Amino acid sequence: MAGIVGYGVYIPSYRIKVEEIARVWGDDPQAISRGLVVEEKSVPGPDEDTATISVEAARNALRRSQIDPSEIGAVYVGSESHPYAVKPTATIVAEAVEATPEMTAADLEFACKAGTAGIQACMGLVDSGIIKYGLAVGADTAQGAPGDALEYTASAGGAAYVIGGKNCLADIKETYSFTTDTPDFYRREGMPYPRHGGRFTGEPAYFKHVLGAARGMMEKTGLSADDFDYAVFHQPNGKFYLKAARKLGFESEQVKPGLLTPVIGNTYSGATPVGLAATLDVAEPGARILAVSYGSGAGSDAFIIEVNDLIEERRDLAPSVAEIIKNKRYVDYALYAKFKGKLRMA
């Protein structure tokens, strides 16, 4: 089965603290931080969008992969915040990394799991022999209405993965998906912000699908939580992530490396891919990782990944997630609102 030849991440440098958002809306910042397990989140600059984030992440992935970009046969960008309604983000990324023109490209949408859907698509094309390498990106500049609970977590960032059959720094040993029609979160065409079902987004949506995919994978492979060195889950907030881990029998040491929501918020399509990248940054050869995404609507993709010796040669060829996160500067709510386009002139 195909594996990970290279991976890369990009997170905007701007940050806003939970306290600053709470100050504007008269909320209790300590209660929010405790309830969501979030302290601050990333904010895209005025010149950043899903396309620019995807390009930066892809370039970092190619640095680690050490391949010729012209050998990439497919580029998929998964997001729910593509900058154009009719104009693919994937072609922008492909052109920027010099993968064009002998390749296919497409934008994918499935709420927050579109990035892992792209990984699966690349795996299929690689394993079938149609392409040599595929590039899958999960990135977002997430939306949250002013004053809505989502505003405390909806952030920006993304990760890219070069998928191939040889010279892999990690092998994808198995994949498994769990999908139903569950309308927990949606945004119609023309709506500036999504709507969500509040508590309905928990048990019947996130937990049903994340746990369903993880348990389905374990049943399929005969593995249990004790058989994994690390686990990464979709992280709309830190609370859901840690609760899912406990329900599946994972210890905090297994899931802590991939938990990034407390310091960058929920990067939506980037959440699981970025968390996986942070885990690959610290994993030793031979480590086994369980990664489970989630997308509202709703579905989860699960992967079993085993790290190879090549990780030690390529890990330092691009910035680590920790290094990228450390590069930050804070903004107040006024600048945040300006950057996010929340202030609209008549």
Curated annotation (Swiss-Prot):
Residues that, per the record, bind CoA: R199, K239
Binding positions ((3S)-3-hydroxy-3-methylglutaryl-CoA): D28, C112, T153, T201, H234, K243, N266, S296
Record's keyword terms, sorted: Acyltransferase, Isoprene biosynthesis, Transferase
Organism for this UniProt entry: Methanothermobacter thermautotrophicus (strain ATCC 29096 / DSM 1053 / JCM 10044 / NBRC 100330 / Delta H) (Methanobacterium thermoautotrophicum)
Subunit organization: Interacts with acetoacetyl-CoA thiolase that catalyzes the precedent step in the pathway and with a DUF35 protein. The acetoacetyl-CoA thiolase/HMG-CoA synthase complex channels the intermediate via a fused CoA-binding site, which allows for efficient coupling of the endergonic thiolase reaction with the exergonic HMGCS reaction.
GO process terms (BP): farnesyl diphosphate biosynthetic process, mevalonate pathway; isopentenyl diphosphate biosynthetic process, mevalonate pathway
Pathway linked to the protein: Metabolic intermediate biosynthesis; (R)-mevalonate biosynthesis; (R)-mevalonate from acetyl-CoA: step 2/3
Family statement: Belongs to the thiolase-like superfamily. Archaeal HMG-CoA synthase family.
Catalyzed reactions per annotation: acetoacetyl-CoA + acetyl-CoA + H2O = (3S)-3-hydroxy-3-methylglutaryl-CoA + CoA + H(+)
Enzyme Commission no: 2.3.3.10
InterPro entries for this protein: ACP_syn_III_C, HMG_CoA_Synthase, Thiolase-like
Free-text function comment from the UniProt entry: Catalyzes the condensation of acetyl-CoA with acetoacetyl-CoA to form 3-hydroxy-3-methylglutaryl-CoA (HMG-CoA). Functions in the mevalonate (MVA) pathway leading to isopentenyl diphosphate (IPP), a key precursor for the biosynthesis of isoprenoid compounds that are building blocks of archaeal membrane lipids.
Catalytic site: E80 (proton donor/acceptor), C112 (acyl-thioester intermediate), H234 (proton donor/acceptor)
Annotated signal sequence range: none
GO molecular function: acetyl-CoA C-acetyltransferase activity; hydroxymethylglutaryl-CoA synthase activity
Enzyme class label: transferase
Protein name: Hydroxymethylglutaryl-CoA synthase
Pfam family, one: ACP_syn_III_C
